[in-house]
């Protein structure tokens, strides 16, 4: 399977996806990576530790989270996708379940969509991904 410019073998290999949450209320890192320079340093460290794909998320899905508008989520993830794409040669996954955010992320350079709802939340998501040719 090709993701970005890399070929991933589907048998006999394990791959590591690193998480870059750009949310102020993440349950796993509490918004540590909202700053561009700290985020880039974190991606660099994860690559050095063996990360194969970076997963960028802009909306917390912790228990009791507040639903963001597409515009709010796009404002968080698109600049980070662009800066990671410009600085590193690594496939970028976008963690979103909203088709509008996925479209913006794909335009910004995302190589994969990570939809935690499995294409069941947003009726347009499957169409957006199919038209883009990206993996999901």
Residue spans for each PLM region:
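N-terminal amphipathic alpha-helix/helix-capping segment at the start of soluble metabolic enzymes
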Residues: 1-21
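Conserved anion-binding
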Residues: 24-28, 60-64, 101, 108, ...
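Short, well-ordered coil/turn segments that N-cap beta-strands
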Residues: 11-16, 51-52, 88-90, 109-111, ...
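Alpha-helix-loop-beta-strand connector modules within alpha/beta enzyme cores
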Residues: 66-94, 99, 103, 127-136
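Active-site mouth loops of central-metabolism enzymes
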Residues: 22-41, 66, 91-93
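Catalytic beta/alpha-barrel core
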Residues: 88-97, 111-121
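Conserved, mostly hydrophobic/aromatic
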Residues: 20, 46, 50, 95, ...
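Glycine-rich, proline-tolerant flexible connector loops at the mouths of alpha/beta enzymes
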Residues: 26-28, 52-79
């Amino acid at each position: 399977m090709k993701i970005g410019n890399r070929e991933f073998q589907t048998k006999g290999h394990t791959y590591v996806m690193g998480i870059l949450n750009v949310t102020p209320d993440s349950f796993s890192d509490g918004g540590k990576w909202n700053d561009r320079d700290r985020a880039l340093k974190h991606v660099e460290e994860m690559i050095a530790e063996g990360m194969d794909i970076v997963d960028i998320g802009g909306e917390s899905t912790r228990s009791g989270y507040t639903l963001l508008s597409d515009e709010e989520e796009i404002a968080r993830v698109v600049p980070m996708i662009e800066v990671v794409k410009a600085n590193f040669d690594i496939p970028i996954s976008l963690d979103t379940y909203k088709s509008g955010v996925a479209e913006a992320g794909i335009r910004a350079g995302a190589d994969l969509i990570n939809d935690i709802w499995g294409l069941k939340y947003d009726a347009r998501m499957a169409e957006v991904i199919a038209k883009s040719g990206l993996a999901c």
